[in-house]
């Protein structure tokens, strides 16, 4: 039986933060039915409403094909996902997206429901973690040019590619998000962000097969707080420098987070032989708990996946004003701290304050390595901090 669309008006002051009288556009159907058309119709009606409105997917299990919801809308809009939506297995094949919200100012996504990407079959055929020349898979949920938004109390399960991708947004908050995929699921970044300003990621649990959070170029004023990450590849700034059109990264704060069993911890990564010259400045990691984390603190300015770069040409990305404060816990390998900076642009003003990282493996005590950086030391450091030599690039005075 086909899906249906119900439209009715109710008082939703407690549910909506926008208005005491809001029109609610419901998109539902029989169990396991395809509600794609109903969702698009509901969103179109809500987007044209003269007052704040709500799109509601009720409790239940539904199928959802490629769904692109585009503004601008006449008034703020709330998208409430109470049910569980799964990919339909057809309309997203060969596409790079599943659910898209774009060009919306004044937006809420909530409801306690789940976006189920059903990625298990796709992961087996995915080789994007081995080569850049691979077939792209759909990102589960994209936010493109979305401003003044709150995304809260939703789950992303088993994404085929990234769980959430956030591009060119302003004043967005992610709160109490759950992201779930197996550790072996390739390219399933939890939240990837680029060219946004004023984003907060709070009280969120991420277990996935790639970076829990990855910060791309052009990010400004990002706060990541009270996030639990693991399994996964840690919290990363970068990679930066692969493309010539990239922009500076400024004011990134990661605080009061816990990393558990991740293959990397707190990481900044830039490409050698970079295609641009940009700056990443004001990056602060503080009050972090580590539990069996490999490579807990890592600056890698020789990041070169798929061997698609020339490591003989140093990275042209400048890293300035970087701090690691009150980082404590256990490492799964002896490389507790590794600061591998560019010989073309040595890291500037890197501060290491009060770190205590323990390792008890058979290959010796934990190490603290520095290349092309002389960090400022504050408080105590375990392992004992290096005072790294600065190696000048050829032709530099």
Curated annotation (Swiss-Prot):
One example of a Gene Ontology biological process annotation: carbohydrate metabolic process
Catalytic activity: (1,4-alpha-D-galacturonosyl)n+m + H2O = (1,4-alpha-D-galacturonosyl)n + (1,4-alpha-D-galacturonosyl)m
Domain of life: Eukaryota
PbH1 repeats: 169-195, 196-217, 219-239, 249-270
Residues forming the catalytic site: 210 (proton donor), 233
Organism: Brassica napus (Rape)
Signal peptide interval: 1-22
GO cellular component: extracellular region
Family of this protein: Belongs to the glycosyl hydrolase 28 family.
Matches recorded under SUPFAM superfamilies: Pectin lyase-like
Entry protein name: Polygalacturonase
S-S bonds: 212-229, 341-347, 370-386
Cell location: Secreted; Secreted, Cell wall
Lineage of the species this protein comes from: Eukaryota, Viridiplantae, Streptophyta, Embryophyta, Tracheophyta
